[in-house]
Amino acid sequence: MADFFAEWRGPLPTLTAAQIAVLDRLKQRYLIYADSGAITEGTVNLILLAPLLETLGLMDQPYQVRGEKYVRFELEDGDTTLEGLIDALLIAEQFWLIVIESKRYGFSVRQAIAQTLGYMVSAPQDRSFALITTGEDFLFVKCDRNMAQYGLSDKFTLTTAAGNELHTVAQILLQLVRLGAQRA
């Protein structure tokens, strides 16, 4: 179903010139770190993710960022329990806006889809969104428990020569947060 996750396609919010300048600096910062060696999840969170959320105004009220939120849930078969830590969770009034899962440099964002969907199933609402990132690559996920369906965005990367895809990532993130906040 092609229209299940159309929210990431647009129309998307417009970024300010100041936001674009910061996003360009964040891309360059990431590439410098990547060129100097392996980047851990913690480094991605410090040099890219936290500044991205700050630039978009998502670190202050009415939003809250929770780091390393523990989740535990049972699968419908009753025999399997999954548990783990969400790297970051953006919420507004107990409504999960975005689950953020970061992975180390060299890890494929696609490898984190199953883990991220597991976290999304434990969200307090039926529909949730997530962002998976290695710092270099970004993938958005939508999950709807009522429909037993999920969808993926295109993969966005900082290593493209065709501009700064972090701009698009920021726009999609703002769009999904706004949609989530409207439902809260």
Where are these regions (language model features)?
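Short hydrophobic alpha-helical segments used for membrane anchoring or interfacial signaling
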Residues: 132-134
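A short, conserved, highly charged catalytic patch centered on acidic carboxylates
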Residues: 1-127, 137-184
